[in-house]
C-alpha cells in the first residue's frame, strides 16, 4: 500500500492479462491501514477507480477496525473466523456477527464470513443476513490444478451450502 505506483501496476497488470477488474479483490489488514490514513485513502481511491473490489480482512479483531470502516469506503467486510468457530454456542459472538452484518448493510458492503466449517454455521449466518462465506465447509486448501477442476465442475459441491 505504500508504493505510490501500486494503482498503476494493478491497472497495467489487469490490461496485460485481460483480467476484468471486478474479478480482483484486494484485502486490507489492520497493519496496512494503520500507517497513514490520508495516504491510504488516496491510494485506495486510485485502486477503486480501476473497478477493483476492496475488502477489510479479519474485521472485528483489530483495535481500529470500526474507526477505519467509514474512512476507507471498502466493498467487502470479512468477519474473522474467531467469531464463527463457536457461533452455535456463543451468544456474544452471535451478537457481534449480527452487528457486523448490520454495519456492512449500512455501509453498502458485502459481508463474508471466514472459517465456516459446518452446515449449521452456514445456516445460522444465512439466517442472520450473511450471504457469503468461505471455509472448510466449501473446500480445503488445494493445488491450482484441483482448484481449476473444482471451478469447471458442472455441479459445484458447495452450491447448496446456504
Language model regions located:
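Short, conserved glycine- and acidic-residue-centered signature motifs
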Residues: 40, 92-93, 97
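C-terminal helical cap(s) of enzyme catalytic domains, especially alpha/beta-barrels
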Residues: 126, 142-162
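A short alpha-helix in the C-terminal ATP-binding CA
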Residues: 28, 96-99
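Residue-level marker of structural boundaries
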Residues: 74, 93, 152-156
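The catalytic core of metal-dependent phosphodiesterases that act on cyclic dinucleotides
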Residues: 2-87, 103, 107-141
Amino acid at each position: 500500500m505504500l508504493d505510490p505506483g501500486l494503482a498503476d501496476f494493478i491497472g497495467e497488470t489487469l490490461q496485460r492479462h485481460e483480467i476484468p477488474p471486478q474479478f480482483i479483490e484486494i484485502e486490507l489488514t489492520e497493519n496496512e491501514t494503520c500507517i497513514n490514513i490520508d495516504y491510504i485513502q488516496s491510494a485506495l481511491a486510485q485502486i477503486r477507480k480501476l473497478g477493483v473490489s476492496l475488502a477489510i480482512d479479519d474485521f472485528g479483531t483489530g483495535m481500529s477496525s470500526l474507526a477505519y470502516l467509514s474512512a476507507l469506503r471498502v466493498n467487502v467486510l470479512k468477519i474473522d473466523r474467531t467469531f464463527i468457530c463457536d457461533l452455535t454456542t456463543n451468544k456474544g459472538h452471535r451478537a457481534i456477527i449480527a452487528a457486523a452484518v448490520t454495519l456492512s448493510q449500512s455501509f453498502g458492503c458485502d459481508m463474508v464470513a471466514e472459517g465456516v466449517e459446518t452446515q449449521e454455521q452456514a445456516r445460522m449466518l444465512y439466517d442472520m443476513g450473511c450471504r457469503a462465506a468461505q471455509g472448510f465447509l466449501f473446500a480445503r486448501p488445494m493445488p491450482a490444478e484441483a482448484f481449476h477442476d473444482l471451478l469447471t465442475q458442472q455441479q459445484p459441491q458447495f452450491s447448496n451450502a446456504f
